[in-house]
């Protein structure tokens, strides 16, 4: 999609694939000291979710990596294999707002005693075994959705990267410039 935009805008549009936290170096490297606007798209693409080698979604399955850049950071499988139940529960609560965080974390730790929780299917099953969701709330999503979100945010240090990127974007904006953040 991005490639289709370039002919329309020519040299007024510069696209770079990088982490938000790299904006302070990427923009000057592309010749920008000041900009009129910046766009941050915080969403996952359906291609990332469907890629079974990445482990972003439980529907696609595959190994639990969850890194946006497979050459950086610690994959989700390592966090699941090494963090204590209390640390996992805190992670699920902080980044996923998961009300069953402690039960799911215990299910992960119990399961890894016999075999590693190494695939999206394994983690989805732990999410389901963490106990039923609140019966008074309608169930619109898979029980492991918030756990997957929490792990992805932790693996990619998304909140820290976003904070650094937003600060850099504000420094780059000309007076009257616009910063647009897409989040859904």
Model-identified regions with their sequence ranges:
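S-adenosyl-L-methionine-dependent methyltransferase catalytic core, i.e., the SAM/SAH-binding region
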Residues: 1-184
């Amino acid at each position: 999609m991005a490639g289709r935009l370039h002919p329309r805008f020519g040299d007024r549009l510069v696209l770079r694939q990088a982490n938000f936290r790299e904006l302070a170096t990427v923009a000057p490297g592309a010749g920008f000291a000041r900009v009129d606007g910046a766009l941050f798209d915080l969403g996952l693409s359906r291609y990332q979710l469907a890629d079974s080698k990445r482990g972003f979604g439980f529907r696609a399955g595959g190994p639990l990596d969850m890194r946006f850049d497979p050459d950086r950071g610690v994959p989700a499988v390592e966090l699941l294999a090494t963090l204590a139940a209390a640390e996992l529960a805190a992670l699920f609560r902080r980044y996923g707002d998961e009300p069953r965080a402690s039960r799911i974390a215990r299910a992960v730790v119990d399961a890894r005693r016999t075999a590693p929780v190494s695939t999206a299917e394994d983690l989805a099953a732990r999410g389901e075994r963490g106990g039923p969701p609140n019966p008074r709330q309608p169930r619109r999503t898979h029980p492991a959705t918030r756990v997957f979100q929490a792990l992805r945010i932790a693996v990619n240090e998304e909140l820290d990267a976003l904070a650094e990127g937003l600060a850099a974007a504000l420094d780059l904006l000309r007076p009257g410039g616009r910063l647009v953040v897409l989040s859904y």
